[in-house]
């Protein structure tokens, strides 16, 4: 067994000198929420401490390259809300200053007019404000002007390079109807009427669809003087892609004449079963559209080269498989036509994400999860790839948001995080990967916390493979004492336990409560190549669960481990329900958040059918066959869609999958279990959690149910989040301490 160890705290970071935040002195909005001044007792991290941390996001480098604009959200547990305001910092990390102290959140802030002004969204509309005193200690936004009047609100926007045009996201009615659609007098009636899939998605009923509109960038932006990019389409598509797509799915060409965008031009059942999303080139002048002919699965994140001669994007080859390898593609563009499509990462083992062109249009920086760490890479036109960040750097880096020249040295401006701290800005030297943090938003809080230790272990699986497992130890860990342990079961199922930071599944917080926390990167994780990732599809009840038991047995072998829990969300919740019926006496308690309990009924009630169809055993040969209508007589093809992962399929993989559902093994349940679910969870509906709890009660198993009526697959409201943490740790402490 191989081990590598890192300690938390200031010594684990490459920090520049800490500086004092300068703030404006003008009158503050009464609804403003500012940085927390929480005082921590005995260095112990608590849920209250976690929720007090500022959340930094969306950095933007000024046109002159001297100043970084970014936002920070602060949370008030008492008011049960967060508020996001704007900050600036010099590009070298000196002199951080607060730019706004508003009571309403500000988002999507962008430099305009050569840095003399900023455009942003507040209250669902686009605003413009002049910057004043940016180089001093008291910067301000003045002369605030509302530019838009869009009744359905604006979600995001992107301004053309010459700042004469703007594209923005708003909403149109969908095919899902409500009572007032047929009778305006029924404005107090609540119902949804659907005649096809998908009528709900993630956390909302699909009564509206996002569309992207183009308008002149000036005061008076309204629907009547805007052009819908999808206006020529006969069907109701979405742009950007729901539920988590944004402006990263659209990009202006450097000359402002074209917009590249990603869109799944399918509706109903075809939409629900397919991931076939294409890249389209929209001509702003005449509204014509050209598709990049890829077929297959997701094609996303289009990005023009600075010289306008090429387009880069991310592409998955197989329709219906959302965890396919994400390839970095490029194509030439001239005279409105696409040519020379090529895969720059054909020989790269990992998934590409977040492409960023170099200024000379010859190379692309991107990030990728590789062996449990998210790093930054560069690929040249010939497909040669160089890792920029250091291979042994225990951080997760986002893609660079800017490339700067500091004398002879090229630097990347990006953000990073780890299990020790949330997102901060960082500069990375391209030559050697040396990283220097340039913001310290939460240092006044983190510096009060007791240090802990993180370890990387390679655990042997039942078939002799090495599995990366992160292990976090409590502060003041003493191997001669006894500690309870937690095995974290990953969601997804395709994902990775890396150095990411979470405000719910926070492993530093768990270790601070006195637990040894193990994070196994079992079969199905995405940072170890496609073979390791793809093994899990059609084998939910197989090797990946044995991987958890291997990690648990590894932990159990340590003399300092006492009782042991298994906890997880989503697929991790499914894993917990499965382990409850097969673990013997390995675990002393379980926690399942938003887990799948009954695979058969999960297929009937979930929304993204492509995922269930593929992973439940359908795979490629049973996934999606366009062009047919009605039952084909083979027991699998209905409505033109092969449903080989369905409960009625005779496909051997699917038959095995449903036979091994957690609900079929409940007579072996005997270990205390906490079931948590949100009623607005449409990915894994909440009756799955209730069914698991009801069953545990009927089996005589000590159990508890926590239901959040107004939360989805995640827990987002501050007071609900705090309550979630309290229930989580109360249950662990009751059965493991």
Q: What are the roles of these predicted feature ranges?
A:
Residues 441-563, 569-570, 604:
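Cap/lid segment of the alpha/beta-hydrolase catalytic domain
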